[in-house]
Amino acid sequence: MPFRYRYFPEKGCLYTVGKGKVSLQEFLDYHLSIQIDNPKPVLRILADYRELDPSDLKTSDIEKLKESALNKVEAKYAKVREATVVSDLLTWGLSRQYDGSYYSELYDLQVFTDIDEARSWLELPPETVLKFDA
């Protein structure tokens, strides 16, 4: 699976990294795999997709991805703030399409090319360390 994630309960932040080519099914499986015990009311997501290749995704896939994400968080959180960090225009455009595919008071997504700007938007202090266990 091209995704890894870790939840940091003290920050209420899900940190996820995507690498390599990704299919619709892999994205959907990733959404299903996320398990967060005792979540805070507001979920912050820092999605580092700078090394993710979404070139196999179709326009219709974007709607399915957003629906899957909304289904995962509805009735669990008062608010979701996702900062998606990308490195190229294709991924940036697909991420903006994803954000615009549904309006939701619950789910606020912004797309960035700079991870520090994304962290700032999520109101994560600059000294916050988000990493995976070895």
Describe every region a protein language model picked out:
Residues M1-A134:
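Amphipathic, Lys/Arg-enriched alpha-helical "gate/interface" segment within cytosolic domains
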